[in-house]
UniProtKB/Swiss-Prot annotation:
PANTHER family: SIMILAR TO RIKEN CDNA 2300002M23, STG PROTEIN. This is Uncharacterized protein C6orf15. Transmembrane segments: none annotated. Residues 41-60 have a biased composition (Polar residues). The gene is C6orf15. GO terms for cellular component: extracellular matrix; extracellular region.
Amino acid sequence: MQGRVAGSCAPLGLLLVCLHLPGLFARSIGVVEEKVSQNLGTNLPQLGQPSSTGPSNSEHPQPALDPRSNDLARVPLKLSVPASDGFPPAGGSAVQRWPPSWGLPAMDSWPPEDPWQMMAAAAEDRLGEALPEELSYLSSAAALAPGSGPLPGESSPDATGLSPKASLLHQDSESRRLPRSNSLGAGGKILSQRPPWSLIHRVLPDHPWGTLNPSVSWGGGGPGTGWGTRPMPHPEGIWGINNQPPGTSWGNINRYPGGSWGNINRYPGGSWGNINRYPGGSWGNIHLYPGINNPFPPGVLRPPGSSWNIPAGFPNPPSPRLQWG
């Protein structure tokens, strides 16, 4: 039992040691960093850094300065020097004692002109060159019309306080715009004053969508037809009929109306499948002349020739023309 307890306590001890090792390492690293920072604080006056003279500084060493703080101190110095007009920055007197080689040059060496105005003039010049010809000549024609003064938005170089260099750049940009406006002349004024919508209304007055004839439908042959339709020459005919006269049956090839379906006789009124040249013959009759009696007895029903269901004792008609009519 004791061996088992000792074996189970060994991994727990290892876990505790592993958990305490990072804390020990962190403490040792922190002590080393503190010593290094103290050494740097005592050695800073030897590197040329300004320090307040007196025996009290050696007794009470100043806290160490991180090298990153030097870079951060340089950035506000660079940003605050152009914005400040001779006023000391908020960093104090220690910031003013930086060597001039590390920061910007002194204020006396700056040019007398304002750099922001020069940059604005250069940007205006580039914008004038990048404009398309259509927009540039319209704006210049309106701005440089003969007998018209300067625009209210513009001002002279003397009023804005521009330097001679900036005024020369402004005059150069204006001279570049002059030939474009002079080449157009009065046409540029007309186009700038009147938009192209007036031309559209002149071409198609009172028709905003370009409808030339609203009474006629799109693609129609007449005002009463449907979309893209043509009037039929024979509206009474049936679909697929080749016959000219109306009222004939479907697929009839006879020249005369009223014939039976599939009849190949030239005269109407013949029975179905009759091959005789004259109408009124009996069904299946192969005689050339009509009116010949049938060989069947009188009581038998006769096929279609003159009639179908003929009762017994009914006299046979003498002529087929009377029955056909």
